[in-house]
Amino acid sequence: MAIETKSKINSLLMNIIPGGILFSEGLKKQGYSDQLMKQYRKSGWLTSLSKGVMYRSGDSLSALAALASCQEQTGKQYRVAAHSALELSGYYHFVPMGKPHLMVASNEPRTPQWAKSDFFDMTIEFFTTSAFGLIQKQAIKQNNYTVQASSPELAFMECLLLAPNRYNFMDLYYIMEQLTALRPAKVQQLLETTNNMTVKRMFLYMAEKANYPWYKAIDVSRINIGTSKIQLCKGGVYVSKYKITIPRELAEYE
């Protein structure tokens, strides 16, 4: 019995994503009982992170590896999103003040308890939204694992959705200046299916201002931007074409 237990823990430790975490619900499906997992913790092989979640004792926890572990073991529809997804796609490097944040989009209202831990290399920040009728995802290969993330087109729109509370519009335009290779068909799909008028109008305004070739391939006549005025800031500049009041700094930037 002891030999079997050691063989199972060796197999488990060999297959865990470096820096990742383990979910008891996934382990049970692989034949690991609650009693066996308790024995692994008692023996010091595994350490509890939160209820039903463990990691290999002594590991430095990676937020990305943990998210990949969750996607793989539980099937949760979490994905790397917003500026974090843009970083993974190589489009943008966000320089944080203090500990970096990993933005995660979820279809569940609550942040899982394990994601609130301070043990990760990044602060994991969850958000939920029903603004996008079409979710464009991509699988991004990391060192020893693959993680699901928003497409670059969706990721930038997620940034716009979270502005101005999470992001500054001027900073987002600096990102737009790097998005030289967005795919117009993907952009078209997202703009036609999102129900958020601010996202539609600000994306179109910024894309037109940047004057990329891909913008010229978008059929704006198929995109409903609504009729009501939107004020994004006080003391800004009103853009009549898109019926939005934007920061003066952005309007005057060339």
Annotate each PLM feature.
Residues 39, 84-88, 155-159:
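Residue-level signal for well-ordered alpha-helical scaffold segments within enzymatic catalytic domains
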Residues 42-44, 55, 99-105, 222-223:
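Short linear loop/turn motifs
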Residues 1-83, 180-195, 199:
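Short beta-edge/loop segments at beta->alpha junctions of small alpha/beta modules
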Residues 30, 136-254:
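Hydrophobic alpha-helical interaction segments
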Residues 67-72, 119, 207-211:
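Long, compositionally biased
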Residues 69-100, 226, 230-240, 249-254:
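Positively charged, aromatic-accented nucleic-acid-binding surfaces
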Residues 82, 86-139:
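Exposed, interaction-prone assembly regions rather than primary DNA-binding/catalytic cores
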